[in-house]
UniProtKB/Swiss-Prot annotation:
Cell cycle associated protein capable of promoting cell proliferation through the activation of CDK2 at the G1/S phase transition. SUPFAM superfamilies: Cullin repeat-like. Residues 34-49 have a biased composition (Pro residues). It holds the Pfam family Cullin. The keyword Cell cycle applies. It comes from Mus musculus. GO terms for molecular function: protein kinase binding; ubiquitin protein ligase binding. Residues 1-11 have a biased composition (Acidic residues). GO terms for biological process: G1/S transition of mitotic cell cycle; positive regulation of cell population proliferation; positive regulation of protein kinase activity; ubiquitin-dependent protein catabolic process. This is CDK2-associated and cullin domain-containing protein 1. Interacts with CDK2. Keywords: Cell cycle. The keyword Cell cycle applies. The gene is Cacul1.
Length: 377
C-alpha cells in the first residue's frame, strides 16, 4: 500500500511539473511572436524662454551646429542653461542626423555680425608699432652712421695686434638694420667716402717721408690697411650680400683694395720701386720680412707691376720668371758668383766649410777625451 501511494505521488508531481514547463514555453513563444511595445514618447517641449540660449539645431556664426535636446533645458541649476535633470530619452531610431546645407550656410553668413571696431583698432596698433621701428634718413645720419664712422676710424688707425674697445655686435646690428630699412646705397656711399678720405691723408704722409724711412712707412701703411679690411668687410657683410653683389655685381673687398691701389699705390709706385731695387743690391739694408711684405702686397694690388722689376718679384713670388733652360746655366752660375763676391765685400766671410767646430779636433785628440770614450764603451 505504501509503495503504491508513493508511486501515485511521484506521478502527480511529474504531471504538475510538466504543466508548469508547458505554460512557460507557451509564454516564451508568445513573447517572440508579438512585437515589442513602443517606448513612451518624450514630453512636448515647453515654450522657449527669452534667453541667450541658442535654438536646438541652430547654426552658430562660427559655422558649427549646436544640437540641444529640449528636455535638457527644462530644469536649470544655479547657472542658466546647465542641464540638471536626467538625460533625455533616445529617439526611436537612436541617431540624431544633422545636415548642413549650402542655403543654411549662406543664410548664416548674411546674418553674421559685421567686424567690430576692436579688430580695426588692433590692425592700426600693429601698424603704428611697425612705423615706430622705421629708420628714416635723418635717423640714419644722426644715430646709426656716427657709430659706424667711429668704428671705421678705429679699425683703420689701429696697429697690428692692438685691442680696440668697440662692440662688433653693435656695429653688425647697425649695418643689418640699415640694410633692412633700405639705406644700403647711402651707407655704401658713406663708407667709400670715409675710406677714400683716410687713404688720401695716408698718401700725403708718405709723400712727406724721407727716403730712408719711405720703404718702412709704406710697409706700415699697407699692412695696417690690409689688416683693417679683415674686420671691415665682415662687419658690412649684409650690405655686401644684398646690395653690392646683387645690384652692383661687385665685391666689397675688391672695391676697398682698389681704393688703396688708386689713392696710394699708384701715386707712389714710381718712387718706391727704385728704392726697392737699391735696397735689393745692398744686403740687409731692408729687413727681408719688410721686403717680402711690400713685394707681395704690390703683386696683390696689381700683378702688372711685375714687369717693372721681374727679378725682384721672382725672389718672393714663385713662377714669375720663365722656366730655366740649359743654355743659360752658365749665366745663372755667374750671377751666383757675383752675389758671393758682393757678400764678401760687405764683410760676410765664408769661414771654415768643414763640419768640425773650432777646438773639436783638439778635444778629441786629448788623452782625457780618449779615456772618457773608453769608459763609455
Amino acid at each position: 500500500m505504501e509503495e503504491s501511494m508513493e508511486e501515485e505521488e511521484m506521478l502527480t508531481y511529474e504531471a504538475m511539473m510538466d504543466d508548469q514547463n508547458h505554460n512557460n514555453w507557451e509564454a516564451a513563444a508568445d513573447s517572440f511572436r508579438q512585437p515589442p511595445p513602443a517606448p513612451p514618447l518624450p514630453p512636448p517641449p515647453p515654450p522657449r524662454p527669452s534667453s541667450s540660449i541658442p535654438d536646438p539645431g541652430r547654426e552658430l556664426p562660427g559655422g558649427q551646429l549646436l544640437a540641444v535636446h529640449a528636455g535638457s533645458m527644462e530644469r536649470k541649476g544655479p547657472k542658466e542653461g546647465l542641464p540638471m535633470g536626467p538625460p533625455p530619452l533616445p529617439e526611436p531610431n537612436g541617431v540624431i542626423m544633422m545636415l548642413k546645407s549650402c542655403d543654411a550656410a549662406a543664410a548664416v553668413a548674411k546674418t553674421a555680425p559685421a567686424p567690430t571696431s576692436s579688430s580695426t583698432i588692433n590692425i592700426n596698433t600693429s601698424t603704428s608699432k611697425f612705423l615706430m621701428n622705421v629708420i628714416t634718413i635723418e635717423d640714419y645720419k644722426s644715430t646709426y652712421w656716427p657709430k659706424l664712422d667711429g668704428a671705421i676710424d678705429q679699425l683703420l688707425t689701429q696697429s697690428p695686434g692692438d685691442y680696440i674697445p668697440i662692440s662688433y655686435e653693435q656695429i653688425y646690428s647697425c649695418v643689418y638694420k640699415c640694410v633692412c630699412q633700405q639705406h644700403s646705397e647711402q651707407m655704401y656711399s658713406d663708407l667709400i667716402k670715409k675710406i677714400t678720405s683716410h687713404l688720401e691723408r695716408v698718401s700725403k704722409e708718405l709723400q712727406a717721408s724721407p727716403p730712408d724711412l719711405y720703404i718702412e712707412r709704406f710697409n706700415i701703411a699697407l699692412g695696417q690697411y690690409m689688416g683693417a679690411l679683415q674686420s671691415i668687410v665682415p662687419l658690412f657683410i649684409y650690405m655686401n650680400k644684398f646690395y653690392i653683389e646683387t645690384k652692383l655685381n661687385r665685391d666689397l673687398k675688391d672695391d676697398l683694395i682698389k681704393l688703396f691701389t688708386e689713392h696710394v699705390a699708384e701715386k707712389h709706385i714710381y718712387s718706391l720701386m727704385p728704392l726697392l731695387l737699391e735696397a735689393q743690391s745692398t744686403p740687409f739694408q731692408v729687413t727681408p720680412s719688410t721686403m717680402a711684405n711690400i713685394v707681395k702686397g704690390l703683386y696683390t694690388l696689381r700683378p702688372e707691376w711685375v714687369q717693372m722689376a721681374p727679378t725682384l718679384f721672382s725672389k718672393f713670388i714663385p713662377n714669375i720668371l720663365p722656366p730655366a733652360v740649359e743654355s743659360e746655366l752658365s749665366e745663372y752660375a755667374a750671377q751666383d758668383q757675383k752675389l758671393q763676391r758682393e757678400l764678401i765685400q760687405n764683410g760676410f766671410t765664408r769661414g771654415d766649410q768643414s763640419r768640425k767646430r773650432a777646438g773639436d779636433e783638439l778635444a778629441y785628440n786629448s788623452p782625457s777625451a780618449c779615456a772618457s770614450s773608453r769608459g763609455y764603451r
